[in-house]
A protein has these predicted regions:
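Short Pro-Gly-centered flexible turn/kink motifs
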Residues: 95-106
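Non-catalytic terminal regions with compositionally biased, polar/charged low complexity
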Residues: 105-178
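A structural signal for short secondary-structure junctions
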Residues: 10-13, 79-81, 93-97, 171-174
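Secondary-structure transition/turn motif
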Residues: 5-7, 67, 135-141
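Short conserved micro-motifs at the rims of enzyme active sites and ligand-binding pockets
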Residues: 30, 63-65, 113-115
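Generic recognition of flexible, low-complexity loop/linker segments
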Residues: 3, 85-93, 120-122, 164-168
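Trp/Gly-enriched beta-strand surface patches
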Residues: 33-88, 154
Length: 178
């Protein structure tokens, strides 16, 4: 997941990106999160979903465990409570040009997640206000999110031209090139 050019003029409240927010409803979930420790770059939830933060995103990460969180809602003056954990990326008040990078790995375990963190299997080719382009190093896939009509694209990519904003995913197959 990539985010680019995050900005606003709100100086009263901080801006954040939520990576995950999970309710701890069962006793098993409580026990899991009570004993949970992260290295600050990788997180794994009790469902086996792993989260990897790039080095630049770890600086703004905020992990919170709220057992319980008591809130008074907008529609009722009666307090409600619940137990939850969250991971957010903090961009500050009135951010200008903030960005983030993280990966979500479903059906993983702690060992596989740590291995991924040591050697991520993707490469960000472009991350700016015009495009997010990411290449998977394991399966020859390149994903393009073009926000604007691109002026330039990576020279070594199969997508050489686009006349509008679009989403494109291309798998290179050198064995079947014509």
């Amino acid at each position: 997941m990539l985010g680019t050019d995050i900005e606003n003029t709100n100086t009263e409240y901080p801006t954040e990106t939520t990576v995950f927010q999970l309710a701890a409803i069962t006793p098993e979930n409580h026990k899991y999160w009570d004993g949970y420790k992260s290295d600050g770059q990788t997180y794994i939830d009790p469902n086996g979903v792993g989260y990897y933060l790039s080095k630049s995103s770890t600086r703004s990460a905020k992990y919170e465990k709220n057992f319980p969180q008591v809130t008074v809602g907008e529609r009722s003056t009666k307090p409600t409570s619940g137990d939850w954990v969250s991971l957010t990326l903090q961009h500050g008040k009135a951010p200008r040009g903030a960005s983030y990078e993280y990966a979500v790995l479903p059906r993983t375990d702690a060992v596989s997640l740590k291995a991924f963190a040591k050697k991520p299997s993707y490469k960000v080719l472009q991350q700016d206000r015009n495009a997010h382009i990411v290449r998977s190093l394991t399966d020859n896939l390149t994903s393009y999110v073009l926000f604007e009509t691109p002026q330039t694209l990576p020279a070594d990519g199969l997508l050489q031209k686009a006349d509008t904003s679009c989403l494109v995913m291309i798998r290179e197959d050198r064995a079947n090139c014509y």
